[in-house]
Every structure is written in structure tokens, then in C-alpha cells.
């Protein structure tokens, strides 16, 4: 696919960019030679990129899966002791015998991908320009244990809405970067790459692509990055969209920390409090290890099944959904979707480098950050918490759109791409007037 030249309509020049000239030859990186793009000149060029895993890397992956040394079965009938043996063995069997990385690799390489060096780190990103002249530039940030994989289903509906149930007036230019230490981006070699620094890098990226003003979206770690974009660059960031917003009132955070029950909560607020309490009480094992000792996770770089189990253990609802997938059910994601993401972590050797973001972060997660630009909120029921509208209004005084959904969880754009896309179209439509 290639970018399409277009002319901005009158009055919309601040949200549209001229076409950059990509004259650098496309670079292909083979895992056996290098795992991330290398920029020997540390310049500011934007270089076309594609990835092809070596046959040797894929053979080694299968060998390691088959050679897994399994622990004994859990002593309970549920997942309270962690990822269940039967689930991870079903995943491993499918991964070794049926999964096809090359299929996903071809899908990824069909999209325009680039790398550019920002603040000493090569940043990989997908950049798909819409053919429609009114397209709004939208940068979308993933989280952990996600990646650019979780955003791919929304690229077509955003850039070519007329072909996906929308109208030309709903078009977006889409930029999907891999965070530093994730996927095909470089691994930082110095301290300091927290959400604030990543937000600054994203602003540099958008400037480098020619976008003076833009909108942004994110979930999981993409939420604080997106919020910091709005806090640091309110004149450039016209609005943001969040599906796991930092909107928990201080008194609720205090109640969770002290183990007390807040009073006077509406039903949806009580449910959100219970979701958060469960996560903080039962679901932070992975986060505590990565926050305190990310370098200790050597096993994740050596065992693909160990990596898969670690990723599956992120949150209870996502684990249950994935377990059902490998029992033969279909709930928005497929088995291949799950393994595309896990295999990307494996082939890029980013289990530890991605975990360091937890160690680097100094922001109070879930606490409002003082965002003062228009905000669009998507609230999904099996997210870590389904943010109540009352909390969202209090956290974001300029909230312009809120939608509560009956289905969907932590990986919103991946699990429910249609619902996610409708929110983005509807939420940002007023910016086009």
C-alpha cells in the first residue's frame, strides 16, 4: 500500500499534513541478523520498514515449544493459582502444529511501516493515510501485554470508512507506533523512558510526519501516554480517546488502599469499585514483578510457553476469554490473534525490555492527570474497570462523548473493533465542523 496525495479543504489545514517524500529504500530485517531497526547515522529520516523472521527463528520457536518441561497440574479447579495447565498446553499444541506466523507477517508487511530515530531510539510505526481529503490524523498507542497487533483491525474502518459502514466524512489518517522496547522499535539503552518521555517522542513523530495538530487514542499504557500528550501539548492535541481512562476519584483510590468500603456509590460506581478492588487484590502479581524486578524475567526470553503464560495472566477476564478460545469458542478474538501477539514478543525478544516500562513509570495509575482538552470515553464491561460516566465527567471536565458498551474488555479495539470505531467516529465528529 502507498500513501495517496490529497488536498486539505479550506479551514482544515491545521489538522492535515502535506505528503512527505519517502525516498529511502525500504529496509528488510531478518531476525537472525538483527532484531530491531538500526540507524547508523542517528538522523531524522523516516525510513520504510518491513520484517521477515528467519526460517531458523521459526524452527527454533517450534523446537522450544515442543521441548517445554511442564509443571504439575494446579491443585484447584479454577485459575486462582494462575494460568491452568490444560489451557496453556492447548495453546502450545496449536502454536507448534497449526499456527502460521507467515500469514500474519504478510498481513503486517502489506501495511506502510516505517522507522525513525527519536531521542536515541528507533521508533517503528504504521502510517496509513486515508484517500479522503478531510481525514483527521490519529495516533493510537498500545499497552502491555498488547502491541500494534491489537490495532490492526481498525486500520481499514478508520482510513476507508465508506468501505466499512461509515462515510467519507469519518476518515482518519492512522499512525500506530510501537512503544520503545516493544515490537520492532528499538530497546532503550538509557534510563528515563516513561510515559511522559514516550508522549514527547510521539509529539516529535507527529511533527516529523507533518502534522501540526492531531488527535490521540490509547488504552492500558496507551492511556497515560495519550493523557500526557494532552497535558504537555494542549495546543497540538485537539482531543483524545481513552478506553481505560485515569478517572478513579481520590476517595476511591484511598478506599482501595485502606481496604474500606466507600459509601453512597451508585450501582455502576459500586461495580467499578469492586472490579478495581479485585484487580488490586488479586491481579497485580505480574505488575509488581515488572515494577520492582523486570530484569529478573530471563525465563520469558528463553521459554516461549513461559512467555505465553505470563502474557495470559495479565487480567482475569482476558484470561478467561482466551481459555475459551482454546476450548473452541469464538469471542471476537481468534487463537491466531492471540498467537500473533505472543509470537511478535518472542521474535523481537522484547519480553524484558517491554517490562521495564513498569519500572520506569512514576505516574499514579488510574488517578486523574489534569487533562484539559476534549475527551472521548469508551467504557467496556470486562476492562480492568468499566469507568462510570460520573467518574469520567469529574476526571475530564471537557468530556464530549461517553459510551458504555455491553460487551468487550481490556483489548477493546482488538476484541470489539466495530464498537471502538463507532465511538471514535462519533466522538471526534464535532472536530470536523
Regions found by a protein language model. Name each.
Residues 56-129, 134, 346-349, 353-366:
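Non-catalytic accessory segments flanking enzyme active sites
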Residues 135-143:
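Short beta-strand element of the alpha/beta-hydrolase
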